[in-house]
């Protein structure tokens, strides 16, 4: 009967009995699998952890209430700095400590050198160092403060100038003193007031407070200084500065023929401002060395100031070279201050023979010296017609030595610029000087002579 029993059934019974015993022995809660059962190659899709699959009972998503904290795989030692680094002893300094020590020793060695330089520049006696070392910091405290500049040692002796510069400065001071000595007290005051101006403002502002204009010479070319009027009407002449610049070339060659003889001057009072005619008869002789042509228009217009100024005028008795053909004439001042001062009532600022360079140039080609007289009417500005101003006429003469002389003639009271013959017959100055036989020379001859001379002078200036 024992042999009839099936061994397979007996084995099944044994397995069941073992499983029942295990279930009885097992705790009520879920148990964690042993670490040997985890496979790191598996990954759970529910929780994302490695070691089990989504079907495994070890997944915390299935047994959420009894989820266990995952155990660490192993200890990670050596990453945390449990023993911090201790500072090295001073007996064995590293390379960085050696560099720091050298940098500290260098400024200590430079301190005495810096003190010596400071004593040399400041001139102060050396201070005794204090025992606690405070003197070194106090002596260089002002270097750290940006309140004042660094003191510079200066000697009481003046620097020695170059002999060439010293001679030049001495000549400038002597020349300035001689010019101031020859001027009137009014001009001294005006020059002293204009000394603070710039070089360009000083030239035009020297005669700003003067009642009469003057011609100042600076260098080789004379400078034309015109006094501006105090009250200028609306219809005044606007082209006067252009005319004054054009006459600058004509007045450049106006020099006395005999430099050692100075003509006597006679004071003449200024006439009242009631007269409204431009009574002028001045002779200006100039050679062919002028840079500007003779046909430069000279325009004059009268501007009546509010208060007429009365003062003496210094006028030469005879013209510079006009006495060779006619009688000497005196310049009369204008009835009012005009903007064309030097062309109507010029006061020539003449220099001494040592200062005036003698330029006596002859014409390049010889022409027959004919004593000619020709009156020409200069262009008149139409804006000044309602002021009662008359056109200015100039009489050109050719002298025996190849020079040309010009005379400023007075215009008649009525307007007749179209008839120069009647004007010459009525002018008293022309009647006195036209006694000699006159030959009329066309204006082209005058223009040709002056054009050739101006071109030759320009070439000479380029060569210099």
Swiss-Prot record:
Residues 180-197 have a biased composition (Low complexity). Residues 1-42, 69-389, 415-437 are annotated as: Disordered. InterPro entries: FAM90, Znf-CCHC_6. Residues 74-89, 97-114 have a biased composition (Basic and acidic residues). It comes from Homo sapiens (Human). PANTHER family: FAMILY WITH SEQUENCE SIMILARITY 90 MEMBER A11, PSEUDOGENE-RELATED (PTHR16035:SF14), PROTEIN FAM90A1 (PTHR16035). Belongs to the FAM90 family. The lineage of its organism: Eukaryota, Metazoa, Chordata, Craniata, Vertebrata. Pfam families: zf-CCHC_6. This is Protein FAM90A23. Signal peptide: none annotated. It comes from the Eukaryota.
